[in-house]
């Protein structure tokens, strides 16, 4: 009797219905995210919330996107800036603590990082008010102050090629009427063989104290690292005695 053979049906591959595990998406940094900073070689630890405390500041802009921030070899966020006065900046961002020491230096850092509330607070302090408000307003009344200051230094350097000291004269021309006689002053200095490099300041419309202007000039030149002292040189009356010109001498010592 014939017996049929059993036919085995092909078995299809088993497919797993269990979904494959997915790698977790990176979390977006939150305001409480702790970050490590390398500020000019000095390390600080803070949070994004602290750095972003004042929208519009340079720090808030730097850390608005961590992908854009520079990092050092250890992964710290790097700020290429001297770190000496960064801690007072960070303390203010953390707690609102206003610095009480090194005010001018911290003020410059606050300006650099564009932290406007801190800048305003520091400008109300005597150390900054006198320099940035009172003195600055005074000098704004002197036309061409910065340019003439630079000219004084250039002339003094030019005369110091073979000399230990060099001098520059400063002539104050207070009014436009007085300015018309300025050439007479130059002729007088030349005739008396006192003619040196002369820089004219003025005319101006405000009422200024000459001694205050001389003090500002000497202070600003010294701030550039030069050794200089000023003194009254002479008063020149015009031939008709209508005006008097005050002339001052600035002496630079080079070695």
Curated annotation (Swiss-Prot):
What biological-process GO terms show up in the record? protein homooligomerization
Taxonomic superkingdom: Eukaryota
Q: Which organism is it from?
A: Homo sapiens
Q: Segment Disordered: which positions?
A: 1-29
**PANTHER family, alphabetized:** NADH DEHYDROGENASE [UBIQUINONE] 1 SUBUNIT C2-RELATED (PTHR13099:SF0), NADH-UBIQUINONE OXIDOREDUCTASE SUBUNIT B14.5B (PTHR13099)
Q: What lineage does UniProt assign to this protein's organism?
A: Eukaryota, Metazoa, Chordata, Craniata, Vertebrata
* Gene3D superfamilies listed in its UniProt record: Potassium Channel Kv1.1, Chain A
Q: Name one Pfam family in it.
A: BTB_2
> What InterPro entries has UniProt attached to this entry?
BTB/POZ_dom (IPR000210), SKP1/BTB/POZ_sf (IPR011333), T1-type_BTB (IPR003131)
This protein is called what? BTB/POZ domain-containing protein KCTD14
Q: Where is the BTB domain?
A: 33-130
């Amino acid at each position: 009797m014939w017996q049929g053979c059993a036919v085995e049906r092909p078995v299809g591959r088993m497919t797993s219905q269990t979904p494959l595990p997915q790698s977790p998406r990176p979390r977006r940094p939150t305001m409480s995210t702790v970050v490590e900073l390398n500020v000019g070689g000095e390390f600080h630890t803070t949070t994004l919330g602290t750095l972003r405390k004042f929208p519009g500041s340079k720090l808030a802009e730097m850390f608005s996107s961590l992908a854009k921030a520079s990092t050092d070899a250890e992964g710290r966020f790097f700020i290429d800036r001297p770190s000496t006065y960064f801690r007072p900046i960070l303390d203010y961002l953390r707690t609102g603590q206003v610095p009480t020491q090194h005010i001018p230096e911290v003020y410059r850092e606050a300006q650099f990082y564009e932290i406007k509330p801190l800048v305003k607070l520091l400008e109300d302090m005597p150390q900054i008010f006198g320099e940035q408000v009172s003195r600055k307003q005074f000098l704004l009344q002197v036309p061409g102050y910065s340019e003439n200051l630079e000219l004084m230094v250039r002339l003094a350097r030019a005369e110091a090629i073979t000399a230990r000291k060099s001098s520059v004269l400063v002539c104050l021309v207070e009014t436009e009427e007085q300015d018309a006689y300025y050439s007479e002053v130059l002729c007088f200095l030349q005739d008396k063989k006192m003619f040196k490099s002369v820089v004219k300041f003025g005319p101006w419309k405000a009422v200024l104290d000459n001694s205050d202007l001389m003090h500002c000039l000497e202070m600003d030149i010294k701030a550039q690292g030069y050794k200089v002292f000023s003194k009254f040189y002479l008063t020149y009356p015009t031939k008709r005695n209508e005006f008097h010109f005050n002339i001052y001498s600035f002496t630079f010592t080079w070695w």
